[in-house]
Amino acid sequence: MTQLHFDNRLRQQLPGYQEEGARRREVRAAWSAVMPTPVAAPYLIAHSAEMAHVLGLDASEVASAAFAQVFGGNALYPGMQPWAVNYGGHQFGHWAGQLGDGRAISLGEAIGIDGGRYELQLKGAGPTPYSRGADGRAVLRSSIREFLCSESMHHLGVPTTRALSLVGTGDAVVRDMFYDGRPQREPGAIVCRVAPSFIRFGNFELPSARGDNALLRQWVDFTIARDFPELVGTAEALYADWFAQVCQRTAVMVAHWMRVGFVHGVMNTDNMSILGLTIDYGPYGWVDDYDPDWTPNTTDAQGRRYRFGTQPQVAYWNLGRLAQAMAPLFADQAPLQQGLNRFRDTYLACDRRDTAAKLGLAECRDEDLELIDALRALMRDAEMDMTLTFRGLIDLSPVHPDPAQLHDAFYDDHKRVASASQLQEWLQRYAARLQQDALSPDERRALMRLANPRYVLRNYLAQQAIDQAEQGDPSGVQELLEVMRRPYDDQSGRAAFAARRPEWARDRAGCSMLSCSS
């Protein structure tokens, strides 16, 4: 039998409801006990070998029928004590009240072989007290996307939750994918998400909004003690240091999003991790042809609140809501503003660091920010692929910069021809800057290869894997996972995974924009 050691501190140290299964309109506690709802025939589709290793699970254990039973929601390992957490949140800028884990059930906090804490959470394992009438299930397509993106982001170096397993349930789930009144039966699945903590901004917002300062303080004290043990101090000074840390980590996370071209799609405060991890992979996407106004979320198509270019500002706004929630614990609000200033300072520093790395420079001067902004404007106007453009600059000659290096980045030949002189002018500016820089050509290329991925999880690649899996063939999911394990390497025989979005995928559902239906 698999031996995992569990230390379920959240359930032990925060107030909750011990009785299982009861649905409540309003919950005045941190968590509720709940059991996963069994499924018909759980089977393993894919898993992360790295994550399994950290947890001390070997290949034979992962391949066992018992593993599929546990991570399909039909059984528990010793020490597991399932629960769902209560939280609120601001959604699309408006307070939404109590939300909670509507279809996420935490099995326990496992201690890995590295001594780290890893909360194991099933997404799609049935209803919880916070499901608000929903079935608590998830479909295969959204589960594949979450599984692949969790691991892809990790290997890109982006702070993120992880994924241990993707399990098919053998049951159908009814969903209206486009919210057009035409629901369909789809195959069900369950992802086991993994993180040191799944605590969100909304865990603090809800008790604060209700005036429950005692529970608010319990949440803060618990989070600092368990997840920020390096922080020391008392009372407001400790809380201020903690809030500044949250702001700093959030800035680092969002800067990485902007570096690799990731668009989260639903940056509600209930989808913001207190650890600065990317969490809740729904209608996300990667920027193909560069457009700062692009969002992959059909729900946000009108207002585009969560579009690519505004993600740093939205993160700052969300932190403002967290500061607002924390205000009852402070006699003086100045430390909260100082924390918000930490976000701005950290983000600007990360942006300069990433600008230098993406362009292959030893340092980022003020004029380099203008240089990269000019490139972004060119990419937008000429419909150039963001990933391919930056990757194409790696082998550019500083002596004779050749625009042909970037031909594959264009989506429209007419725009390529029309922008030729503008591109040549920019390349000359860039080449001149490289000749002034302290890095050798080899150092420059090495730096750029670590900042500019060759492979990203483009929506059309994920959709192709989904199409295969829905026909009973999981090999596409497994191969895509393998490719995304080495996103910065040139992988032999896998050029197709680095290609720009094909024309057939420009407007296809799942390849361009997605709904929140999952």
UniProtKB/Swiss-Prot annotation:
Which residues bind Mg(2+) per the record? N271, D280
Name of the protein: Protein nucleotidyltransferase YdiU
As for family, the record states: Belongs to the SELO family.
Q: Which organism is it from?
A: Xanthomonas oryzae pv. oryzae (strain KACC10331 / KXO85)
Query: PANTHER family annotated for this entry?
Result: PROTEIN ADENYLYLTRANSFERASE SELO, MITOCHONDRIAL
Q: So what EC number does this one have? A: 2.7.7.-, 2.7.7.108
Keywords on record: ATP-binding, Magnesium, Manganese, Metal-binding, Nucleotide-binding, Nucleotidyltransferase, Transferase
The GO terms this record gives for MF are: AMPylase activity; ATP binding; magnesium ion binding
Catalysed reaction equations from the record: L-seryl-[protein] + ATP = 3-O-(5'-adenylyl)-L-seryl-[protein] + diphosphate; L-threonyl-[protein] + ATP = 3-O-(5'-adenylyl)-L-threonyl-[protein] + diphosphate; L-tyrosyl-[protein] + ATP = O-(5'-adenylyl)-L-tyrosyl-[protein] + diphosphate; L-histidyl-[protein] + UTP = N(tele)-(5'-uridylyl)-L-histidyl-[protein] + diphosphate
What function is annotated for this protein?
Nucleotidyltransferase involved in the post-translational modification of proteins. It can catalyze the addition of adenosine monophosphate (AMP) or uridine monophosphate (UMP) to a protein, resulting in modifications known as AMPylation and UMPylation.
Give the active-site positions: D270
